[in-house]
């Protein structure tokens, strides 16, 4: 049974501007430790891909927060929601801490998709009750 749906579109230029204003602190606020390691590696080699990576993660977390009906309120936090990739490349949501406990207590499962182009990143999330 569908519990919730969420979608988000993110202007990559806004993410780039935030990075220019706040530096790495902005990424540290949004990304989990694992995501931050990936972002750092991509940014060092291909700065534009690093910005796109951050934008897709931002967008996916926004879509997820809408699908669970909390928005960006506790227990939903940027760093407790991680967008990982399966070996196939498929994006997967990995939760941590109080958010994981909250999600598991409700017997929910989530599916997410992300896409990006030159100026925009978009995400769609479906949350189901098991």
Swiss-Prot record:
Chemical reaction(s) catalysed = apo-[ACP] + CoA = holo-[ACP] + adenosine 3',5'-bisphosphate + H(+)
Q: HAMAP family annotated for this entry?
A: AcpS (MF_00101)
GO CC aspect terms = cytoplasm
Coiled-coil ranges per the record? none
Question: Looking at the record's lineage, which domain of life comes first?
Answer: Bacteria
Q: What is this protein called?
A: Holo-[acyl-carrier-protein] synthase
Q: Where in the cell is it found?
A: Cytoplasm
Residues that, per the record, bind Mg(2+): 8, 62
GO: which molecular function terms?
holo-[acyl-carrier-protein] synthase activity; magnesium ion binding
Question: What Pfam families does this protein's entry cite?
Answer: ACPS
Lineage here is: Bacteria, Pseudomonadati, Pseudomonadota, Betaproteobacteria, Burkholderiales
Name where it mostly resides: cytoplasm
The record ties this protein, via Gene3D superfamilies, to:
4'-phosphopantetheinyl transferase domain (3.90.470.20)
> What's the encoding gene here?
acpS
Q: Which family does it belong to?
A: Belongs to the P-Pant transferase superfamily. AcpS family.
What cofactor does its activity depend on? Mg(2+)
Describe the task this protein carries out. Transfers the 4'-phosphopantetheine moiety from coenzyme A to a Ser of acyl-carrier-protein.
């Amino acid at each position: 049974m569908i519990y919730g749906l969420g979608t988000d579109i993110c202007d990559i230029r806004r993410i780039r501007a935030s990075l220019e204003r706040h530096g790495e602190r902005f990424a540290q606020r949004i990304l989990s430790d694992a995501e931050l390691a990936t972002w750092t590696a991509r940014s060092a080699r291909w700065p534009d891909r690093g910005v796109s990576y951050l934008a897709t993660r931002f967008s996916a977390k926004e879509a997820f927060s809408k699908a669970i009906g909390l928005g960006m309120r506790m227990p939903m936090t940027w760093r407790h929601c991680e967008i990982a990739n399966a070996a196939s490349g498929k994006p997967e949501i990995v939760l941590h801490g109080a958010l994981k406990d909250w999600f598991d207590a409700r017997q929910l499962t989530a599916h997410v998709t992300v896409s990006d182009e030159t100026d925009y990143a978009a995400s769609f999330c479906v949350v189901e009750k098991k």
